[in-house]
Amino acid sequence: MKVKLIDHKGSVIGDHNINKEIVNHPINEQLVHQSIVTFQANQRQGTHKTKSRSEVRGGGRKPFSQKGTGRARAGTTRSPIWRGGGIVFGPQPRSYRKNLNKKMKTGALLSTLAFKLSEKKLIVLQDFNDTNKFSKTKDAKNLLDSLNVAKHSLLVLDGADNQSIRSTNNIDNITTLSSDLINASAVARSEYMIITKKGITNLIQNRLKLETKKEVKSKPEKTTKNKEETK
């Protein structure tokens, strides 16, 4: 499948071929959902904490005598039913960590990329060099305006291009990531995905490992003549 190749001014300069493994990959919505839930859960710090009756300051003295007052007996002012008392079954520090194996992560990422291709919302950008790169936020804003991507977009750049990544940090409705850090959650949350040629090459070779796979050649079957010769 071919997608349009865009230069840094927003003009179409050619086509870019996308691997058939990405185009023909089935879209597994359940796996994508599981990947997003795992990603969001791993972002949680889990540092929430409330104090129980044994941790609240004070309450060491018995507030009033056991008998003779007509009130319900009480041994401390830090009981959960008292104002300023401890919290019962409140949140405690915990880990929300979830795990996905490499095969599931790769499958979720392939599903989101295949969906973006089917919706024609994946744009391949010409590689940056010393003469055409995002040296200022203005340059990045002009490119996005020329592409007419008003909604939330994901810009994937080569990991070594730190200057271009910094130039897009102050633009609304755009998330910039290195091709080494791309994940299914970021792709699924974005309306458009813009990626450079180096970025998509790095993604295919290092993350998806599509071009490194070698076909296993089957051994030729022995014929009757070969069998007789071996005997």
For each predicted feature, which ranges?
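Short coil/turn segments at secondary-structure boundaries
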Residues: 47-53
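Glycine/serine-rich anion-binding loops at beta->alpha junctions
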Residues: 53-89
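Extended polybasic, low-complexity segments that bind anionic RNA or targeting/receptor surfaces
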Residues: 1-41, 45, 90-231
